[in-house]
C-alpha cells in the first residue's frame, strides 16, 4: 500500500450529500476482485451520458460535460471535497479502490459512512472529517479560485490552505501509523512473519497429528 505522509493536490468539489457507494462505483463493475481497473468507472453514471458496461473502453464513452470531474479546471484533482455522509450504502470495498485508482489521495467531508471510512484507511486513502462550516468555506474557495490546492500533512494532522492557514483534524493513532508506513492488513501481518512461522513450527512439533489432518 502506498504511504501517505504529506500531499499537496488540486481540489475537486463534489457538491452532493449522501453520495452512496453505488454512485461511486456502480454494481455492474463489481465482478472483479483484482483491485485494478476501477478508476475509469468512478462515478460512472454521473461521469458519462451513456450506460457503462464492463470491458467498454473509456475512449468509446460519452463524457458528461457538466460533471465536476470532467471539467477542465478539475483535471488531475487528487483531493476530493465532499458533503456529509459520503460513502453510504453497501459496504463494497471497490468504492475506495475506484477513488484511489482515479488518483485521489484524500477525501474531506463533514461525515462519512462508517464502513466506507474504515475501508479507505485499508486502501491508502485518507478520509478527513472537518466541521461542516469549515467544509462550506472550502467549497466556496474551490469554486472561486481555479487551480485551488490544499496540502494535507498527516504527520502533523493539519490541512493547509493556500494562504497558509492550518486546519487541524483527528485521526486514530493506529490508522495514522498504518498510512504513514504504507501498511494494509496483509502488510501488518507480514511484519510478524517470523513469529508466525515459529508458532506454526512449535505447534506442529507439539501436535504432529495436525499435519496429517491438514494434509488430508
Swiss-Prot record:
| GO MF annotation: an example | 3-isopropylmalate dehydratase activity
Q: What is its EC number?
A: 4.2.1.33
Which UniProt keywords are given for this protein, alphabetically ordered?
Amino-acid biosynthesis, Branched-chain amino acid biosynthesis, Leucine biosynthesis, Lyase
Q: What is the reaction catalyzed?
A: (2R,3S)-3-isopropylmalate = (2S)-2-isopropylmalate
Which top EC class is given? lyase
Q: Which Gene3D superfamilies match?
A: Aconitase, domain 4
The pathway to which it is assigned is:
Amino-acid biosynthesis; L-leucine biosynthesis; L-leucine from 3-methyl-2-oxobutanoate: step 2/4
One cellular component GO annotation, for this chain's record?
Answer: 3-isopropylmalate dehydratase complex
Q: Name one GO biological process term.
A: L-leucine biosynthetic process
Q: Record keywords: Isomerase included?
A: no
Q: Where is the signal peptide?
A: none
Any Pfam family hit: Aconitase_C
Q: Which branch of life, at top level?
A: Bacteria
Query: Which family is annotated?
Result: Belongs to the LeuD family. LeuD type 1 subfamily.
Q: What does this protein do?
A: Catalyzes the isomerization between 2-isopropylmalate and 3-isopropylmalate, via the formation of 2-isopropylmaleate.
Self-association and partners = Heterodimer of LeuC and LeuD.
Descriptive protein name: 3-isopropylmalate dehydratase small subunit
Amino acid at each position: 500500500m502506498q504511504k501517505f505522509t504529506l500531499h499537496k493536490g488540486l481540489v475537486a468539489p463534489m457538491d452532493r450529500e449522501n453520495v452512496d457507494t453505488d454512485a461511486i462505483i456502480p454494481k455492474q463493475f463489481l465482478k472483479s476482485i483484482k483491485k485494478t481497473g476501477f478508476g475509469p468507472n468512478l462515478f460512472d453514471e454521473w461521469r458519462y451520458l451513456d450506460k457503462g458496461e464492463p470491458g467498454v473502453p473509456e475512449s468509446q464513452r460519452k463524457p458528461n460535460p457538466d460533471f465536476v470531474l470532467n471539467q477542465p479546471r478539475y483535471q488531475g484533482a487528487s483531493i476530493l471535497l465532499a458533503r456529509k455522509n459520503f460513502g453510504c450504502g453497501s459496504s463494497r470495498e471497490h468504492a475506495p479502490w475506484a477513488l484511489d485508482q482515479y488518483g485521489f489521495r484524500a477525501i474531506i467531508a463533514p461525515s462519512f459512512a462508517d464502513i466506507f471510512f474504515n475501508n479507505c484507511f485499508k486502501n491508502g486513502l485518507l478520509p478527513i472529517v472537518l466541521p461542516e462550516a469549515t467544509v462550506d468555506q472550502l467549497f466556496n474557495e474551490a469554486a472561486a479560485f481555479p487551480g485551488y490546492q490544499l496540502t494535507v500533512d498527516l504527520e502533523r494532522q493539519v490541512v493547509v490552505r493556500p494562504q497558509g492557514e492550518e486546519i487541524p483534524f483527528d485521526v486514530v493513532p493506529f490508522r495514522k501509523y498504518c498510512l504513514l508506513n504504507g501498511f494494509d492488513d496483509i502488510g501488518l501481518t507480514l511484519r510478524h512473519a517470523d513469529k508466525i512461522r515459529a508458532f506454526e513450527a512449535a505447534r506442529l512439533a507439539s501436535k504432529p497429528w495436525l499435519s496429517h489432518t491438514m494434509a488430508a
